[in-house]
């Protein structure tokens, strides 16, 4: 950090800036590039036209990026705040950062954390999440010690401290992610709590949460902004799970004239929700909305939406629910919002927003409110007579989902909702190269928003660059793979590249732990067998294709060898195993691996079916954890 910047800045201010930098630096690579700035302005929900935002970003990059490497380092970020403070551009930038949900108040007032730095957090989010979690876990005997929480106090930040609530919420969002037998529920010593928090964090990572900046100690301390950030990711994954065509074919009712199913499938859950709300608003004769913030502040669109989706009592066993529209004409916005929420309550959907959240247009909480409405009352009918190719709706394979969750857990941006469609401009792939220490020259990369004309050309250039990096600096085997294949969304060839990225990422972790010694399959297999042997275990593996792996006994034994005594062998079946036995062993093995601190992305089925690629990642993660033994 150069002297000039440091002399004018206090330690508290510096910590604050670090906090802000981390929030803008979505992929946590230590630099901010222009697409991250675009995201910041998008999330801050500022009433600026697109061209204005582009202008501001260009100016920030021009003034801030002093060494002209196409990205802003932390030093340059500090410089923007110190030197460019007075300019309108910097003021707008600071406003965007302060408005971004859950960000520290730069030069504002907020709760002081233990280190004396400022972290603000959204009281509205806390209130909303507490009510949602209270409802979700009200009948769970394992949570009686903390549920119900008081939404008006700091109960939430204490309640997540032992990891149980987090594990339960993860399972509600993606059922069966965590084997309940692996959650420590009794005699909660600090060590046992640490294990639960490991289990929660590594499982959150496996379902696609970005947890790079969150440690178990942050959760134990109940750091508000980190707790809320993690909970929002977990809750959102659950809310969005069914807003996806392959899991909900009735969404095809939202097809527009001349639109193909393939085009509809490329929409993100947020875009589909907006399309869904507008479908019902159109049927009610009300005007379209463009967002879940400014356009819903007067609650009028919500009144019409509720009236459209409320059950009309026409199906068998379905009671009719009438929405009272009289509050629509209320003159006061807050009273109108309250009246609307009372109607939502009739549908059992008074969740996530208070009248004030509606009137202020809180984008995050309104999105959650609408997603919950969709999940309870989609009010869509699958189109029967149209010429639709339903075979497209196969849904993603396990392998595709694992790759997607791995990418999202690393904080790539934009978020990957659809593996092939969302990689077609290669931006995500280029960010993954950075994660595996392959330098990317961002000045060569075309970034959104792409021009209307020639957009695909810009994306194709990125794809060509991604393949070029794979062949040369990364030394991947990419025979027969060209940029066009990524741009076309060719599944086999895209997967081939993505697997090599994930494999390299996994091996890099091992090499970092092993003082730079190269790691490969043979080294991992021999380490596994040596470790099992030294611990007096009778299991061993020949390779990652070894059929005996399907019992998961070698994995379970290895976990017990790494952390002696952690496996409860009463829960492990051996001898002649049924498919159910194998599945239960695998489920326990994956959760226990995560509990002792291995970030395993694979699924129990990968072990049962002995999928060599995923099996390799499991053993590599365990080897990494084993090498960390102090």
Swiss-Prot record:
It comes from the Eukaryota. Residues 123-239, 267-378, 397-506, 518-627 form the Calponin-homology (CH) domain. Ca(2+) 2 binds at residues 65, 67, 69, 71, 76. SUPFAM superfamilies: Calponin-homology domain, CH-domain, EF-hand. Ca(2+) 1 binds at residues 25, 27, 29, 36. GO terms for molecular function: actin filament binding; calcium ion binding. Keywords: Actin-binding, Calcium, Cytoplasm, Metal-binding, Phosphoprotein, Repeat. Residues 383-627 are annotated as: Actin-binding 2. The keyword Lipid metabolism does not apply. Residues 12-47, 52-87 form the EF-hand domain. It is found in: Cytoplasm. Residues 109-382 are annotated as: Actin-binding 1. GO terms for biological process: actin filament bundle assembly; actin filament network formation. Gene3D superfamilies: Calponin-like domain (1.10.418.10), EF-hand (1.10.238.10). The modification Phosphoserine is found at residues 268, 293, 326, 339. One of its GO terms (cellular component) is cytoplasm. It holds the Pfam family EF-hand_7. The modification Phosphothreonine is found at residue 391. Monomer. PANTHER family: FIMBRIN/PLASTIN, PLASTIN-3. Actin-bundling protein. This is Plastin-3. It comes from Bos taurus (Bovine).
């Amino acid at each position: 950090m150069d002297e000039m910047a440091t002399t004018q800045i206090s330690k508290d201010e510096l910590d604050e800036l670090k906090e802000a930098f981390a929030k803008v630096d979505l992929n946590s690579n230590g630099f901010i590039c222009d697409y991250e700035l675009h995201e910041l302005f998008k999330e801050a929900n500022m009433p600026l036209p697109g061209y204005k935002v582009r202008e501001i970003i260009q100016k920030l990059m021009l003034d801030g990026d002093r060494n002209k490497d196409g990205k802003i380092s932390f030093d340059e970020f500090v410089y923007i705040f110190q030197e460019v403070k007075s300019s309108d551009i910097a003021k707008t930038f600071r406003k965007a950062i302060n408005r971004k949900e859950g960000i520290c108040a730069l030069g504002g007032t907020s709760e002081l954390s233990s280190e004396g730095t400022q972290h603000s957090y959204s009281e509205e989010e806390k209130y909303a999440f507490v009510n949602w979690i209270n409802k979700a876990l009200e009948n769970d005997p394992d949570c009686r010690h903390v549920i119900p929480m008081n939404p008006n106090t700091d109960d939430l930040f204490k309640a997540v401290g032992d990891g149980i609530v987090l594990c339960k919420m993860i399972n509600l969002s993606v059922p069966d992610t965590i084997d309940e037998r692996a959650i420590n529920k009794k005699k909660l010593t600090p060590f046992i709590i640490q294990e639960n928090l490991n289990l929660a964090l590594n499982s959150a990572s496996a379902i696609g949460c970005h947890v790079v900046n969150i440690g178990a100690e942050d959760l134990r301390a109940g750091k508000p902004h980190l707790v809320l950030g993690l909970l929002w990711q977990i809750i959102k994954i659950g809310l969005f799970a069914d807003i996806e065509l392959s899991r909900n074919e009735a969404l095809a009712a939202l097809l527009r004239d001349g639109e193909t199913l393939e085009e509809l499938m490329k929409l993100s859950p947020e875009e589909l929700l907006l399309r869904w709300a507008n479908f019902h608003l159109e049927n009610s004769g009300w005007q379209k909305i463009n967002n879940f913030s400014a356009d819903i502040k007067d609650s009028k669109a919500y009144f019409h939406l509720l009236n459209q989706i409320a059950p009309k009592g026409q199906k068998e066993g379905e009671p009719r629910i009438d929405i009272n529209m009289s509050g629509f004409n209320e003159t006061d916005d807050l009273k109108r919002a309250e009246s609307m929420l009372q109607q939502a309550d009739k549908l059992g959907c008074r969740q996530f927003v208070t009248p004030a959240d509606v009137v202020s247009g809180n984008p995050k909480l309104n999105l959650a409110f609408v997603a919950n409405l969709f999940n309870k009352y989609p009010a869509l009918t699958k189109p029967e007579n149209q010429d639709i190719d339903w075979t497209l709706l196969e849904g993603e394979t396990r392998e595709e989902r694992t790759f997607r969750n791995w990418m999202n857990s690393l904080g790539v941006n934009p978020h990957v909702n659809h593996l092939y469609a969302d990689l077609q401009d290669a931006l995500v792939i280029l960010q993954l190269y950075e994660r595996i220490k392959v330098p990317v020259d961002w000045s060569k990369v075309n970034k959104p928003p792409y021009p209307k004309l020639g957009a695909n050309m810009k994306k194709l250039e990125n794809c060509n660059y991604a393949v070029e990096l794979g062949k040369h600096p990364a030394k991947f085997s990419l025979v027969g793979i060209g940029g066009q294949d990524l741009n076309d969304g060719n599944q086999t060839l895209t997967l081939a590249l993505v697997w090599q990225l994930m494999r390299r990422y996994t091996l890099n972790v091992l090499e970092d732990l092993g003082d730079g010694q190269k790691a490969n399959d043979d080294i991992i297999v021999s380490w596994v067998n040596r470790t099992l042997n030294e611990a007096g275990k009778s299991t061993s593996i020949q390779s990652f294709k070894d059929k005996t792996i399907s019992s998961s006994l070698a994995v379970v034994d290895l976990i017990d060898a790494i952390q002696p005594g952690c496996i409860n062998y009463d829960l492990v079946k051996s001898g002649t195993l049924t498919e159910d036995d194998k599945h239960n062993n695998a489920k326990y093995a994956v959760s226990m691996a995560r509990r002792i601190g291995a970030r395993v992305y694979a699924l129990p089925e990968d072990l049962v079916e002995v999928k060599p690629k995923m099996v390799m990642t499991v053993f590599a993660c365990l080897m990494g954890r084993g090498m960390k033994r102090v």
